[in-house]
Amino acid sequence: MTSTAVLKAEVYKLRSLNSTAWLLGITALVSLTLSGVAVRSPMEGEEAGLSEVLVGPAFAQFLIMVFASRSATMEFRTGTIWQSRLAVPSWTRLLLGKAGVIAVLAALMGVVLAAGGVAVASVAAPDVDVVPSGGLEWRQLLTVPVALALVAVLSLAVGLLLKSGGATITVLLVWALVVEPALSATGDWLAGIDIGPWMPFLALSDFQGQSGGVSFPGGPYLACVYVAAVTAALLAVAIKVQGRREP
């Protein structure tokens, strides 16, 4: 089976699952709703703007994590992965194809959520200026698809390693919401090194220009390169482990 055929097969599998449309539909609905609500009800003392619009995509990131990890664990639970394995004798080609499709789909969702969030906010609060007006705001808006693609592949890799839907989602959420903030708050406890900026999700936040986070050494764009490298390494480990578990 050619690489193109592998990609087409992965797309077909996703389209054939009712859960795909439901999960992505719920993600879009929740994200766009949050964008509209946030821009109408900004935090006390703050003026509504693009940062409120991006509340929706920021929350949607966690739903994309669930979707991407489930795309891996569901196949092992239902056994459809073995049908694909018969057609594609290489775990590397098969899983790289899956990762590629998931990344593209997540990026497309990012485009929809970012553009849709601005559109919904413009309707919900027409007197609020939500159009990006500077370099930082444009970066905050345009990095949404990239961030969702990276998070999706990282979540897929964790799902391949654990194979359990519940365990994978738990690990991802605890990692992003508990472990990284806790380690960042402890400061330079590890041999005098502040490890907070080196946490993947925190580094990704710096790339996106989110306020209140940590600054990655070398700047936000290097942070993106770092997160991409971590994601690629984790995916490579997941593929290697899968090849050893079931050659």
Residue ranges of each PLM-predicted region?
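Secretory targeting signals
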Residues: 5, 18-70, 95-163, 174-185, ...
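A cytosolic-side transmembrane-helix exit/cap motif
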Residues: 102, 186-195
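Helix-capping/transition residues at the boundaries of transmembrane alpha-helices
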Residues: 13, 73, 84-86, 155, ...
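Transmembrane helix boundary and interhelical loop/hinge segments in multi-pass membrane proteins
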Residues: 47-49, 68-87
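Short coil/turn motifs that cap or connect alpha-helices
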Residues: 90-91
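Short, Lys/Arg-rich, polar N-terminal cytosolic tail immediately upstream
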Residues: 1-11
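Membrane-interface capping segments at transmembrane-helix boundaries
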Residues: 237-247
